[in-house]
């Protein structure tokens, strides 16, 4: 009798394990501030405000230098010029005084790094995710009190090691880094051959799952993955979704009460 009932006793436990596996929490990152009135990549004050109001804990900001070497929020100068009616400038950088006078799509406020810092300092529940710039000296200069709430995408292994040493909340090693393949390969052989900081997190493009190099490395050692950019979960195979812990998105909204830090 007990033997006949055993499958029915085990089945709920088995299904519970499957459910837990499928419901693994994934942090959503508002990509460049997230979508705002249908616009993406604005990196604007209004986009950051909207992302925070929509429940995002992690908000990404692209950071580049102005013509007079001041850090500002923009995906690229070509994009910023196009969004502000200055497409004729191509990819030419603006001076800071010009930058702050612009309006993105005619109505949104561009942000300097100082404004970005003030925004995140005003709400201790928010985490700044950076892109484009990973120079430790520059980040420390503009965000001196945010290290414990910064997720930095590192574009060289040297930057990765230094940022980890300096105590940033999380450092993502970018798949766009020129030394990506060599640094990851070295990481797999640390114990025997190479010293250095072990890479724990990778910022990976959705196409990266198909790279033979990634498939090989992933079999040898599983990295934590922050995936960019996903606006529909159906874009990913179930096995890919299970591998991801953070997702950059323009439109996906956070689910309430699931944004706890791991």
Predicted segments, located by residue:
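Positively charged n-region of N-terminal signal peptides that target proteins for export
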Residues: 1-4
